[in-house]
Regions:
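Bacterial N-terminal signal peptides
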Residues: 7-17
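Acidic, histidine-bearing metal-coordination/catalytic regions of metal-dependent phosphoesterases
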Residues: 19-143, 163-164, 291, 378-399
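Extended active-site neighborhood of metal-dependent phosphoesterases/phosphodiesterases
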Residues: 100-128, 187-286, 317, 329-333, ...
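Active-site environment of divalent metal-dependent phosphoester hydrolases
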Residues: 111, 149-155, 177-180, 207-216, ...
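Conserved, compact domain cores that house catalytic/ligand-binding motifs in diverse enzymes
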Residues: 137-214
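Structural recognition of the beta-strand scaffold that forms the well-ordered cores
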Residues: 140-144, 167-172, 177, 202-207, ...
Length: 399
């Protein structure tokens, strides 16, 4: 009797804490996203996370239609499940068409071999987007770079831009200083992007040299889906405009002690160069009337120092493996590809490398780290407007 009494008292003493734990249990939510990636003429990737492990999908319909299709990620006969981070690819869409989508998800409380226990089922609001138009004569997009984990700066730069006009945002590298903390892409720029535009319009991340650093850098591709092929480098087509994204790799030699023998960027850049040769030979690229390249580190060759305004800067840049290797590999290909303009970053200052016959056959605009770029490609050319964080226009020109 005495033992039973002690057990009862102990249970009663535990009840308040048990009830408190039950009362403070966090609800099942979509806690990041959704955000759009890899939008094309006929497909899109919808990304989001849930607060607990679950089984998720995307419902999609043409705007104005009641016919809803459910899309999930399936691999080797298994639907993706018991996870929190989701990237659901949707294909077979119509070009230049408005769609509406929402997230549906069920929490998974238990996942045993022969018994699955589901919990709460949730659904997001409906959000709208439009597939790209293969016949478009004009496209407008925004470029920002070197944000270095400063979400407030990211927000400020986006606020400078007419986001209602832009079809897409390109983040041109060093959006994070390194990737060393779980959830860092969200707090650095994805959450801000979702708030400003990314539920309805996509962004792509052109990696800088800083995103390759940190013990989590190899997981970055779980959050960023620039292309359906799963590469950071790729090409977007907006009707008559082609935009090539190149992945610069690190700025120093692969053998530099700071990398501890863990990087392989010389080979990676050479791989991209072979891919780029195929792109510029393709019918779709040759049909484009305007061609733009985006890469974080500006490719550099010695003869660029012949321009007086860059005579001091170029020799310094040539001491960095990233600049020199990109110049060696990429400029011979791009010089034959009728490129209109290249956008780069990295220098944290505003620099224009002008077109030089036989050296670099197009201007390279290096944006600083406190400005955003508005780019509008049309039959008039490639219009570029750079506005700094104070709202001052520092460059406005058509190429």
């Amino acid at each position: 009797m005495h033992k039973h009494l002690i057990s009862l008292i102990a249970l009663l003493l535990m009840l308040p804490s048990l009830c408190g734990a039950q009362g403070t249990a966090t609800p099942y939510t979509i806690n990041h996203g959704p955000y759009l990636q890899g939008l094309t003429y006929d497909g899109v990737i919808v990304c989001f996370t849930t607060s607990h492990k679950g089984f998720s999908g995307v419902e999609i319909r043409e705007k104005g239609s009641q016919e809803v299709h459910l899309c999930r990620t399936s691999k080797d006969g298994l639907f993706e499940a018991d996870n929190t981070l989701n990237s659901i690819s949707i294909e077979g869409l119509k070009p230049a068409t408005e769609y509406e989508y929402r997230i549906i998800s069920k929490q998974m409380l238990s996942f045993e071999p022969y018994k699955v226990v589901f919990g709460e089922e949730i659904a997001s609001d409906w959000y709208a987007f439009r597939t790209f138009d293969p016949k478009a004569e004009e496209v407008t997009f925004v470029v920002a770079n070197d944000i270095h984990d400063d979400a407030r700066k990211c927000s400020d730069l986006l606020d400078l831009m007419p986001m209602d006009e832009a079809e897409m945002v390109f983040y041109n590298g060093d959006i994070m200083s390194h990737y060393s903390r779980e959830g860092q892409p969200f707090t650095s720029f994805i959450d801000v992007s979702v708030e400003k535009f990314a539920r309805h319009k996509p962004f792509a991340v052109v990696r800088g040299n800083h995103e390759t650093r940190g013990h989590l850098a190899r997981d970055y591709g779980n959050y960023i889906h620039n292309t359906r092929e799963g590469r950071y480098y790729g090409v977007y087509y907006f009707g008559t405009t082609a935009v090539v994204m190149l992945d610069c790799g690190e700025d120093k030699d692969d053998e530099h002690p700071v990398y501890a023998g863990l990087v392989d960027f010389d080979r990676y850049r050479a791989e991209q160069a072979e891919w780029l040769k195929e792109v510029v030979r393709s019918k779709e690229f040759r049909r484009a009337e305007r061609r733009i390249v985006i890469v974080h580190i500006p490719p550099t060759v010695e003869r660029m120092a012949e321009v007086e305004q860059n005579a001091k800067l170029v020799p310094d840049l040539m001491t960095w493996r990233g600049n020199a290797h990109l110049g060696e590999l990429l400029l011979p290909i791009l010089n034959k590809a009728d490129i209109d303009v290249m956008f780069s970053a990295h220098l944290h200052s505003h620099v224009v490398f002008p077109e030089q016959e036989g050296v670099v056959e197009f201007p390279i605009i290096a944006n600083d780290n406190v400005s955003a770029m508005l780019v509008r490609s049309s039959e008039k050319g490639v219009y570029v407007k750079i506005v700094n964080r104070e709202g001052k226009t520092t460059l406005e020109q058509t190429y």
